Amino acid sequence: RGFMTLLLQNALQEMYDRGIAFSTLIPAEDWLFGYYAGQGYVTVFDYALHTYTPANQTIPHTLSLTTSDRFDANFARNLFPYFDQEMSKRNYCIQHPYNDYITIVEEAYLSEGQLWATYRQNVPTGWALAVPEKDRVCVKELLFDTEQEKTELLQNIHAFWPDKTLVYKTLPAVSG
């Protein structure tokens, strides 16, 4: 048995012993979905993966856009209310408390990723967390008020890593 399997089995036993009947995992990489499925977990949030294709011409920037090339706790902290507000609008998601949010952003920076934000009149209107992988950049989360924020975030992330394919996830439309 591998170390990861043993660790997960010990964690599941500990949860059972404590009477915890429900647990979640958020796979950091795509290959983990299959691994966790083999351990009895199922996918409950169905994201669609899209490849960003830049427009033939650059869309003029009408928003203020900010990023940092190294983890900046103040930058991340100031964006948490926007992140929290936008995530709470979703029908299905895991709501991260502030400390988990900071850990997620900091971990992205440890993987050479970056947090990006758009603003209108100094008010956040878009948020993206992008992490480079071997031959692509994955936008782990993309939140925006309008299509303009979405476009400007993706355009700037692509320009930052121009030699890599840019992929991002979207939630499926909820009917009813």
Predicted feature locations:
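Small-side-chain structural scaffolding
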Residues: 1, 11, 23, 27-28, ...
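Conserved acetyl-CoA-binding loop-helix of GNAT-fold acetyltransferases
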Residues: 1-13, 38, 147-158
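Short, amphipathic alpha-helical segments
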Residues: 5, 9, 26-30, 73, ...
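Conserved GNAT acetyl-CoA-binding A-motif
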Residues: 8, 15-28, 161-172
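Residue-level detector of functional hotspots within protein domains
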Residues: 9-11, 27, 87, 102
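Conserved active-site alpha-helix within GNAT-family acetyltransferase domains
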Residues: 17-22, 28-47, 173-176
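Amide-forming acyltransferase catalytic core, primarily the GNAT-like/NAT-type
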Residues: 42-143, 147-151, 155-156, 169-172
